[in-house]
């Protein structure tokens, strides 16, 4: 016997007794918990409504046939806007405390340098761009051509 959690989004004008009677008629093993949740403002309109009411139910089911029958009936009913079914028995990690994350701790290793090592690390080479001045020479042919035209 599997335990399922069902959340149904209903039309705000709908009576929740209809949802409860549908659950009781579909699941022969019984409904463990039936709870009406608060009205919730929706992120977008569904059937020209900006609010919806939610129903939470925990049911016991003997097989997939009951779940399939509930989905079929919920899809037929126009006032059931959305539904979500979660299998609590096969859900891994439910009702378990969260595992602490493993943290990697870096250890600081002090290096030993002597003055001899320090002098070897400094390079005596010139920098790659030793001369930053432009080596471009002005063309004198252009200026001479202008003088000849005058």
Curated annotation (Swiss-Prot):
Bias (Low complexity): 132-141
InterPro entries: Ribosomal_bS6 (IPR000529), Ribosomal_bS6_sf (IPR035980), Ribosomal_S6_plastid/chlpt (IPR020814), Transl_elong_EF1B/ribsomal_bS6 (IPR014717)
SUPFAM superfamilies linked to this entry: Ribosomal protein S6
Claim: Transmembrane is one of the keywords in the record: no
A GO CC annotation given for this chain: ribonucleoprotein complex
BP term (GO), one: translation
Top-level taxon: Bacteria
Region (Disordered): 92-150
Role description: Binds together with bS18 to 16S ribosomal RNA.
Similarity comment: Belongs to the bacterial ribosomal protein bS6 family.
Protein name according to UniProt: Small ribosomal subunit protein bS6
Organism: Mycoplasmopsis pulmonis (strain UAB CTIP) (Mycoplasma pulmonis)
Gene responsible for this protein: rpsF
